[in-house]
């Protein structure tokens, strides 16, 4: 079995430039966008060549959902939000990254 740390992974240069490293989850790198107006987090699966959700295998898609739910739950509680927004955009950065 290959450990996630052994899989080659390169973060898109725009994400690298515009974000602050927060931590590593089992599948994803967790970043905070460098934007003082909003608490804006990103989950990026540490897998090379992943541009769409369907590029992940079933186990990784499930893990991504678990990590997203975990992040959303904590953000909702911390900020006392009534509704959370999640987006998967790719119009500027093609690498799969989920906005929270």
Where is each model-derived feature located?
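HIT superfamily nucleotide-processing domains
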Residues: 1-100
């Amino acid at each position: 079995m290959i450990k996630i740390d052994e899989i080659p992974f390169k973060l898109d240069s725009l994400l690298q430039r515009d974000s602050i490293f927060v931590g590593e989850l089992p599948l994803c790198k967790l970043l905070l966008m460098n934007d003082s107006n909003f608490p804006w987090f990103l989950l990026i699966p540490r897998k090379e060549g992943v541009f769409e959700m369907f590029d992940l295998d079933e186990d990784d898609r499930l893990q991504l959902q678990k990590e997203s739910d975990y992040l959303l739950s904590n953000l909702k509680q911390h900020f006392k939000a009534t509704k959370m927004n999640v987006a998967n955009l790719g119009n500027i950065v093609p690498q799969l990254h989920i906005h929270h």
